[in-house]
Amino acid sequence: METRSKLMLLACATFSIISLVKSQNQQGFISLYCGLPSNESPYIEPLTNLTYISDVNFVRGGKTGNIKNNSDIDFTSRPYKVLRYFPEGIRNCYSLSVKQGTKYLIRTLFFYGNYDGLNTSPRFDLFLGPNIWTSVDVQKVDGGDGVIEEIIHVTRCNILDICLVKTGTTTPMISAIELRPLRYDTYTARTGSLKKILHFYFTNSGKEVRYPEDVYDRVWIPHSQPEWTQINTTRNVSGFSDGYNPPQDVIKTASIPTNVSEPLTFTWMSESSDDETYAYLYFAEIQQLKANETRQFKILVNGVYYIDYIPRKFEAETLITPAALKCGGGVCRVQLSKTPKSTLPPQMNAIEIFSVIQFPQSDTNTDEVIAIKNIQSTYKVSRISWQGDPCVPIQFSWMGVSCNVIDISTPPRIISLDLSSSGLTGVITPSIQNLTMLRELDLSNNNLTGVIPPSLQNLTMLRELDLSNNNLTGEVPEFLATIKPLLVIHLRGNNLRGSVPQALQDRENNDGLKLLRGKHQPKSWLVAIVASISCVAVTIIVLVLIFIFRRRKSSTRKVIRPSLEMKNRRFKYSEVKEMTNNFEVVLGKGGFGVVYHGFLNNEQVAVKVLSQSSTQGYKEFKTEVELLLRVHHVNLVSLVGYCDKGNDLALIYEFMENGNLKEHLSGKRGGPVLNWPGRLKIAIESALGIEYLHIGCKPPMVHRDVKSTNILLGLRFEAKLADFGLSRSFLVGSQTHVSTNVAGTLGYLDPEYYQKNWLTEKSDVYSFGIVLLEIITGQPVIEQSRDKSYIVEWAKSMLANGDIESIMDRNLHQDYDTSSSWKALELAMLCINPSSTLRPNMTRVAHELNECLEIYNLTKRRSQDQNSSKSSGHTVTFISDIPSAR
């Protein structure tokens, strides 16, 4: 007995009536029939009497598919008439309310049934929270085409996300989800969760056993082998009070070797030789032994001796391997051999096999998950990425949400929330206060009403608060001054009254703020507040602007061509001819004129010479020169100088060795194809250039002609925005748009701008969204040979099929990360929203594109790490911040 206690874990007792009653009442059971319409009554499965409800309230996306033919399928006795499939997005998640710390049997079922008529078995990944559970391959099995995945898992929080993740060209689908609570002291692994390999009971009856015979709805599959003989009894066998409770139909049957001198051997295959496996062996002596009969046998697992064992008479026991097993070559074996004392052969009634699966990534902080999902529910945020864990894995993080992910064992925290231009209505929800680690909160450009709530003072880590361009009322609250880290507050474009509180003014005028650890911060940490203070102040500002405008207008009348600043950049026409070698090499042509190649002080330059036939020539020339003389940004093309002599007008730019983006996407440039990280880098840098025009210039500027031909590429494929002849400035504050004649390029024009002649910075966002579609797809903006000639309509039609490969540029040869590309595509579609108020600003666009690149790099590093781990020695990988062109 001492040896037994050391080598085996023992579970033995009488049958638990209480446990049986609870389970038969389906207490704690969750049974979802996926695809069942919400207006239909719950389905009661006739064989088990289990009640299945529609999954509509547990998942946001997906569509119902109808099984073509299931008349010849008896797949675990479940209904298979409909299913749910997910043609949109990359990750689609079910969100289930569970009890934290509870051990559940979680079962997912996938029955394809050729619902789509394609006869192509789907393949995709299945995630439990932020961790991958398994890769699902729904292939034909035993005359059907179904797969069951089952796991025993202890929930970490009170929300459980089960996610289907698209990995290729096929569409994820699911038929049913089942959760069954288990006793806390059953199925215990030292680490990780337990993935079911098999539940066998030894009989040749052919009968599957499950609920209600099994109180936990385990599915027991009958199993026999040619060298075995089955025995059984009609007498009841006592069960367990501590949790395992095998059904009577399972424990009342057993197998013995037909040749009583031979051992009883059971083998199974592990998925990998590195897998850790637990075996649960069920025994009960079910024969009435004579006085001179004895059944005793040795138990060996993978050739290792464990115990000499005698089954109890009509009383069940479960013997569990005390530590996880590893099976050499992937072949595992349990062998029962009778001892010299035994007169009867060994027997076994049933066996369960589980492999250990690790879920190392911690879920996002529970309180913050609840808060962000309440925010989502309150404002009806319908972003497709807002499913599952908001922070991890990073490639699926929610758009507009940034997190602090320290390591896999520490729950991530939400540190930034950007819901700008998201169509939010109502008051500022109190749920935001539960995101206690927020550093940045952007609720700008919505239709929020009410006062700035006191609950925001609980955001003690907040550095930047943007509430601009809403319909907020009341006074600027004094409590904002108590948020010590707060650096910037944006309040313009609201209906706030009164003056700025003295406490905020004191902080604004203070040369040093007392922050953490009693240290002082420099003046750059002061709070900047932009708010409507009084009608008098506004009136004064308007009068001053009118006065300045009239003076400028008067000055314009006096001087037909006003002199330009920084005359040291002004060149004579003869110098222009000399630097271009008498206009020898043409780089390009446009409505403005011709661009020539030139040299200035042995440096290459591009010289744009204005055509005298250009209708708006000098006006656009003047606009571009004045803009480029006062703005300087690494992602805006630099002006070297200009010529303004009579009718001879020219602009001299820095030379961009690799031409424009469109040449590379179309293949007209020749040479290697831009790879995926290279395209993302170009998109990021272009976005930063536009962002600078919108928020870095004083006054802000709208480019008005963002397109792929106006994105130039340097020697190392660094991107710079060019051609500012159509740019317009707009005022900040209450002014939301500039009324102007429509100008720009067909295909890139914001439909709202085109229809209303209203120009805003969101017009550039729309145009950039078109460029982003070009970058992703490699398709021209307008192509008459396509069924859908306009790239926007074409992209929407392809998205309806949910096939990323059909959308991505074929020249990439599938060499891209699916998660990164889906995120970029979703961002592009957000940018081209017909309503400008629902488009993101360029700051957010640049941020999301950076995340796309981070996701790609992370996936690449993981792949490299996996490859390097297979070889000896150390490998150092350098990740360049300048992706190369291939």
Curated annotation (Swiss-Prot):
Provide the positions where the record notes the PTM Phosphothreonine: T740, T745
Query: Which positions are glycosylated?
Result: N49, N69, N232, N236, N259, N292, N434, N447, N458, N471
InterPro entries cross-referenced by the UniProt entry: Kinase-like_dom_sf (IPR011009), Leu-rich_rpt (IPR001611), LRR_dom_sf (IPR032675), Malectin-like_Carb-bd_dom (IPR024788), Prot_kinase_dom (IPR000719), Protein_kinase_ATP_BS (IPR017441), Ser-Thr/Tyr_kinase_cat_dom (IPR001245), Ser/Thr_kinase_AS (IPR008271)
Q: Which SUPFAM superfamilies match?
A: L domain-like, Protein kinase-like (PK-like)
Q: What EC identifiers does the entry list? A: 2.7.11.1
Q: What class of enzyme is it?
A: transferase
Q: Which reaction does it catalyse?
A: L-seryl-[protein] + ATP = O-phospho-L-seryl-[protein] + ADP + H(+); L-threonyl-[protein] + ATP = O-phospho-L-threonyl-[protein] + ADP + H(+)
Extracellular-side stretches of the chain, per the record, are: 24-528
Compositional bias segments (type: Polar residues): 865-878
Query: What GO cellular component is one of the record's annotations?
Result: plasma membrane
Q: Where is this region: Disordered?
A: 863-886
Which superkingdom, per the lineage?
Answer: Eukaryota
Q: Where is the Protein kinase domain?
A: 581-850
Name this protein carries in UniProt:
Putative leucine-rich repeat receptor-like serine/threonine-protein kinase At2g14440
Which organism is this entry from?
Arabidopsis thaliana
